[in-house]
């Protein structure tokens, strides 16, 4: 479960005001599936530094994190988009859009700067992303061995 303290620690300075109980609740109830919810919460915290690289809204960031989380679970672009934006997807279907048209929307979303930035950061190994914590852990292990 994410707390406001976790959010305050993880979010860049310009987003500290958004670290509210409301946001924590939203992240804690992001999915009915506990595995998906945990993945999205972890990714939201892990990739928060992406928010410093552009002019993004927190809602856009959360949606991009959800999309990338579904992609990392092995889902296709289309299924990831459908799970991230269920209402938007149903609207496209109810408007009679063809699979080809929907695929164009999905492809456009998957190539946005925000999604691309999160995907790029997700390719960086965790130990490299958190080098300082990794080094402290190694130093602690060395001390314990002595």
Spans of features found by a protein language model:
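N-terminal, charge-rich alpha-helical recognition modules
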Residues: 1-136
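Alpha-solenoid helical repeat architecture
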Residues: 71, 145-146
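Buried hydrophobic core positions in alpha-solenoid tandem helical repeats
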Residues: 80, 140-143
């Amino acid at each position: 479960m994410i707390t406001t303290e976790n959010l305050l620690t993880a979010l860049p300075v310009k987003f500290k005001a958004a670290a509210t109980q409301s946001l924590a609740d939203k992240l804690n109830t992001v999915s009915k599936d506990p595995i998906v919810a945990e993945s999205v919460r972890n990714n939201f915290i892990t990739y928060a530094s992406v928010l410093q690289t552009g002019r993004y809204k927190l809602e856009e960031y959360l949606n991009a994190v959800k999309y990338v989380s579904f992609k990392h679970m092995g889902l296709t672009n289309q299924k990831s988009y459908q799970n991230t934006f269920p209402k938007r997807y149903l609207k496209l279907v109810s408007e009679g859009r063809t699979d080809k048209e929907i695929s164009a929307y999905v492809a456009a979303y998957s190539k946005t700067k925000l999604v691309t930035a999160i995907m790029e950061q997700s390719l960086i190994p965790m130990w490299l992303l958190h080098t300082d914590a990794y080094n402290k852990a190694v130093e602690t292990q060395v001390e314990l061995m002595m």
